[in-house]
Amino acid sequence: MAISDALNKRLRARRDEEDDFEDEVSDEMEDIDKDDESNSDVDRPNSESEESAELEEGSEEEDDDDDDISDNQSTASTNDKKALQSEFRQISFGALAKAQNSISKKRKRGEEPETDDKTQSTLNDIRERLRKAREQKLGLTRDNETKNNNSGGHSKPKPPTRSSKHAPTVQSSKMAVSRKRIVIEPPSNATKPRDPRFDPAVSSSSARRNSTSNAYTFLDEYRASEIKQLKDQLARTKDPKQREELKRQLTSAEDRQRTLENKKREREVLREHKQREKQLIKEGKKSQPYFLKKSELKKEVLKKKYESMGSRQRTKALERRRKKIAAKGKKDLPWARRGVE
């Protein structure tokens, strides 16, 4: 039959339109069956021919529409592919790695993969970020160019920032030069101003030391009179507190007087030794002077001290010194040997 031939004919159309077309054809078939039952056999060939013609025309129109739609879709798909490829080339590897890590994490957790809408939104976000970064970079370069133009190319470059606080600092090798300049250099042999009060050459001279000691000799008499007064007060007072205070003052004054006498005696020993060495060099018995060591100087001072004392004072001093040395030796002994003695 012509109807069966028309129905069996293959048509080029999309899946959705084909389903719609089959529904329409099925409806028309039902109508045709009803008309066939009601109409006579004479009218059947005319109706069949008309229906076949209509079906053929509809199929041709649908073929043309399908061709146009497929061409448009192919051009649109190629344009979309090119645009996507250009945009994907601009995406950094870091952003792609982050997206891949997030997708892999969600898959490990058992979450469902993102839909097309979500992927599209992520792509849009990446494009937006790239666009903003590009605009910001262009804006910064333009600002720098304008600043350089305004300043005449003499703007100070900003110091480079560190990637982290643990990274080494970058320092310029150009060091700032001081503003002070030596216009005229003074000659090397020019005399410099000096203060004689703090000049070591003046203060350390033996002549100055001798003159100072000679100028303040009255202090020795004053110290001796002070010691005599303290001894008289100590003999008269009976209050224990005052006696303790007077004893302390008397001991301090005597120690100070003894120290000054030792220093004076040491200076006398050194002066006599220098005079003796000078005399020997002058006589030709020596070519170079001999300088006393500290230990030798101490022995000479002690010898002179004992020579200046009387016989009774010397014996007392020697006895005190012997006891002092013995006590110092006992301190070094262990406790067992101390008990035996």
Swiss-Prot record:
Q: Does the keyword Protein transport apply?
A: no
Naming one, the record's GO cellular component terms include: nucleolus
Task: Identify one Pfam family in the record.
Answer: RRP36
Q: Which keywords does this chain's UniProt record carry?
A: Coiled coil, Nucleus, Ribonucleoprotein, Ribosome biogenesis, rRNA processing
Coiled-coil spans in chain: 116-150, 241-283
Annotated segments matching region Disordered: 1-216, 232-288, 304-341
Assembly with partners or alone: Associates with 90S and pre-40S pre-ribosomal particles.
Q: What is this protein called?
A: rRNA biogenesis protein rrp36
Q: Which organism is it from?
A: Talaromyces stipitatus (strain ATCC 10500 / CBS 375.48 / QM 6759 / NRRL 1006) (Penicillium stipitatum)
